[in-house]
Amino acid sequence: MTADSPERPVVPPPGISLTQDLVALTIREKPDLGPEPGWTHLTEAELDALAEEYRAESHGEPLWIFAYGSLIWKPDFDAVAHRRGTAYGWHRSFCLKMTRWRGSPEQPGLMMALERGGRCDGVIYRLREEDRHAQIRRVLHREIRFRENVSMARWVPVHTAEGKVKALTFWAGPRGERIASKLPLDEVAHILARACGHVGSCAEYLFNTVRHLEEFGIRDRNLWRLQELVAEEIRAIHCEAA
């Protein structure tokens, strides 16, 4: 599975309220405004050093990436195996405020991170061995290519049917003024139904995550309720505009 693989046909899970037609109503042309204010790109040398650090920390063992959101449906590495897995003590949360990518300064969006508490069912992917450094570098560039985000990568224990493994994951335990923790689901839905940036909308992000989790037999209770609420919000917005 590679980042260049063709997108699979969109087949929403049975009973899903948030459809591709509703998602299409949230997509708007937006300019690329560059990185979030105050963020600075890692240099090529810094990315290489960081990739080497994580390569060394894997101690020659298979290196697994724990995916719980967009890395499931849009990875930027070459995987040779995957398994369902559970990270205990963490849960998905739309808590990262974004004014770029899938949000804008006028209508900030929310992206997912892992916050403390509960459990998170996701998928672990094993990186290809022969160019491990390059594979790690690719995923670091995608996930934390800014100096301010370096601390957002961490190792977590993930439980699988084949046993427990140590996996690298991203945006676990974020802190700071950009974090909006414990928002009510209806407030999150209000934001996701409206926010859009140059790479797409927050509703699109939610839709892709829910349908790909379902392909692995994972139904996150909060995300499932959230997609219902976002669908209702989108319908309400367009009824008002009609």
State what each model feature region is.
Residues 2-242:
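A glycine-rich, hydrophobic/aromatic-adjacent loop/helix-cap motif
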